[in-house]
Amino acid sequence: MIDRLDRRRRGLPRVLPALFVLLLVVLVGGCKGLVEDVGGGGGRAPADLETSAAERAAWPDPPKDAVSAKVQRVSDGDTFVATVGGRRERIRVIGVDTPESVDPNQPDEPYGQEASDFAKHYLNGETVRLAGDAEPRDRYGRMLAYVWLRDGTFWNALLAAEGYAQQLTIPPNVTYAPLFRRLVAQARRNHRGLWAEENKHQASS
């Protein structure tokens, strides 16, 4: 009996390292999964989006001359302040238009606050990539840009596809106009975002 206990005790040092390694693998794997769930695009898990990962992967990648920018503050769904090349710039995304939510003298437009919250969730404090079109700035002096999130998602397209924006085509800045037109039409057809609100208003009238 004593002999058997001694043998078991002598076997413990061999078993403990193996158990420790197994526990470490489980913990690291769990942490990796958590990071992947909240990575890219400001922390929102892809499961919260209406569009699939495959759909988003098919959208254009940032061009080689895209520049890096650090988002400082989101004004509303389609406008934010960022540091670009050491300068503070107001950025207006090209090709889409979200409902207004920043004028203190006017009531928010339907779905304006939701669009603003969506942008804050994805952009605040994030590093993004910017690319321009034919005109570098609008009449208000804002930098016009196509925007890509740090995971490569085309932000302008995401706003359109998720139902947070309508198309706004202002020539000559029309590089991705056909894409935005298609995505807005799909969002409207699928009653996403502001288009669901539109259906509610139509049903109640």
Which residue ranges define each predicted feature?
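Small beta-barrel nucleic-acid-binding modules, primarily SNase/OB-fold domains
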Residues: I2-S205
